[in-house]
Amino acid sequence: MRSATLLVPLLSASVGPASAQPAAESSVFRSIELRGGGSVTVRHGDAHRVTVIEGGTNRPIRTDGDRLVIDECSSDCRGGHRIRVEIVAPEIARLAVANGGRIELRGDFPSQSTVAASVSSGGMIDLRPLEAEQASASIDQGGRILVHARSTLSANVSNGGNVTYWGDPSILSSIRLGGVVEQGVSSDLARPIAEFDPQPPPLPALPSIKPPRRGGGH
């Protein structure tokens, strides 16, 4: 499978079926937003790099200020909804997911003073590899955030959702119309992300049905 690597800043980018819109020429991002589904993996590194691994034909990728935005499908979404992206960045200030999808951090990250995460209308963010002195996590209308905080954690959940945290921070939490803020067990700090977000089991095969026998004449 061919991938497209986007270096930030960019002058141009176009690589066959895995192409994506280039990020703005002179911007460096500190935050990442995923809108409308997909899978994003973030690793720590000295230079900013964005690589489209799969899909993305109709999924614009752009920068807006210090934000890297992976947008929803353009008007014609046939064959272009799914996207899988790998990102390298020296610092992550904020992650956001809206309308489904997942952003996860992998590998080693240096500790930071602050980090923030938000999920709206479904989705998942995994910040466990990054330990922050102060962290904030916000969920509205479903979703899940995994976060690692040392000193303080501000967690807000409304209309359902789950914030699971590691470390021993002071907690300032608000839950409206359902939701959970809970401490994770130490053995789950390195647990694979797929085990937190299991896929539904396949539907059982339908039993074969024999056609009814026609009654004979008398």
Question: Where is each model-derived feature located?
Answer:
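Intrinsically disordered, low-complexity terminal regions
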Residues: 1-11, 16-218
